[in-house]
């Protein structure tokens, strides 16, 4: 079968989704002046607020590198300040010291191996920190496989880590990578004891209503045809694992290990700041809630019992992967700015973890 170029496939996907999104207006207007929210099950461990300290770290990094990187964006323009976020103390702490002793495994999202050149989160930023001595590696999960299948792959990667005495092992999950990590922690409890912390970036913690719509209509095969032929062998379960119905039910019946420390960074953006190929799915999700990133609702991205680091003003791809550098309607200046901000964001996340994991709860 003839395969179209990637931009064409993505445009076809957007047009296809339009048929099922309709054009009715959102019931709730876009308003960032709301409190932080999480959709969770009764009895779930509460999310606690760590936004003030993370904002301090990111904003100081931004100010320190603004001139060197040629960035003009304000910190509050990049990190949303919802109306319940406490104000920082008058005397702020200094930036934490780097801790190259952290061992970090990055688990990418769905379709990551299908678009290998753009599917790995924070590639440039991770390389910079590797040069500082950090051990940062990617877990080669299967982009079209289920979370149980990828949990097995993560287990293999965790088991191979040569950790020093008391060396922290951090699992960083992006998008469905977070879902895969949570399944690993529950399914492989002995190996899970090697894990110190889990950091979720735009994580599909509860799944997404988008997948329920498409899976219910049995469009899985159609989506598979859109993806390139270089996807690795898989069990085809990616959509089931991203289903809000399936994942939320799983989460409510599978308590997460209590010895692991959890951190969540969420995303949402205005329609005009969403990449072209996600605007149709944004409009679909907008009917449920306008605070979404084009793939996930903002209230579906927080791990129960995690520390909430903040909300990034970015769409689902821009926050972690360089999709717009390959396929984008944005001008080159904006693309370059987003790439630089992504690097600073990754460093801020690692600095926050270094500080947090150096002290007990």
Where are these regions (language model features)?
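Serine-dependent carboxylesterase/thioesterase catalytic core
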Residues: 152-252
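Bacterial N-terminal signal peptides
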Residues: 11-22
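Bacterial N-terminal signal peptides that target proteins for export
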Residues: 2-12
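Flexible, membrane-associating and regulatory peripheral segments of lipid-active enzymes
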Residues: 23-117, 361
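Glycine-rich His-Gly loop
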Residues: 107-110, 175, 203, 267
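Short aromatic-enriched loop/helix-cap "lid" or pocket-rim segments at secondary-structure transitions
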Residues: 118, 208-214, 273-278
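C-terminal catalytic-base region of ester-bond hydrolases, centering on the histidine
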Residues: 36, 257-361
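Active-site catalytic motif of lipid deacylating hydrolases and related acyltransferases
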Residues: 95-169
């Amino acid at each position: 079968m003839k395969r179209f170029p990637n931009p064409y496939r993505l445009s076809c996907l957007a047009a296809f989704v339009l048929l099922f999104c309709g054009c009715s207006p959102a019931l709730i207007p876009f308003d960032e002046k709301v409190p932080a929210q999480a959709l969770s099950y009764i009895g779930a461990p509460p999310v606690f607020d760590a936004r003030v300290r993370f904002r301090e770290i990111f904003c100081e990094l931004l100010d320190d590198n603004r001139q060197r990187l040629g960035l003009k964006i304000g910190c509050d323009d990049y990190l949303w300040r919802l109306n319940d976020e406490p104000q920082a103390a008058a005397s702020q702490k200094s930036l934490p010291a780097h801790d190259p002793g952290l061992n970090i495994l990055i688990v990418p999202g769905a379709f990551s191996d299908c678009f290998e050149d753009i599917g790995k989160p924070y590639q440039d930023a991770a390389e910079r920190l590797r040069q500082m001595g950090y051990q940062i590696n990617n877990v080669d999960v299967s982009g079209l496989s289920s979370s149980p299948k990828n949990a097995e792959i993560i287990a293999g990667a965790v088991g191979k880590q040569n950790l020093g005495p008391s060396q922290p092992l951090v699992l960083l999950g992006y998008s469905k990578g977070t879902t895969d990590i949570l399944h690993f922690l529950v399914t492989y409890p002995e190996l899970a004891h090697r894990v110190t912390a889990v950091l979720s970036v735009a994580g599909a913690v509860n799944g997404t209503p988008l997948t329920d719509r498409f899976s219910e209509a049995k469009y899985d095969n159609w989506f598979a045809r859109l993806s390139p032929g270089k996807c690795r062998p898989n069990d085809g379960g990616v959509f089931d694992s991203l289903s809000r119905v399936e994942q939320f039910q799983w989460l409510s019946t599978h308590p997460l290990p209590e010895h692991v420390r959890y951190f969540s960074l969420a995303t949402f953006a205005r329609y005009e700041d969403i990449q072209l190929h996600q605007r149709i799915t944004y409009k679909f999700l907008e009917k449920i809630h306008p605070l979404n990133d084009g793939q996930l609702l903002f209230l579906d991205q927080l791990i129960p019992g995690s520390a909430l680091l903040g909300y990034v003003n970015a769409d689902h791809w821009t926050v972690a992967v360089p999709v717009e550098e390959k396929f984008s309607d944005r001008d080159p200046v904006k693309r370059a700015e987003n790439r630089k901000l992504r690097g600073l964001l990754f460093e801020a996340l690692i600095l926050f973890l270094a500080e947090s994991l150096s002290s007990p709860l």
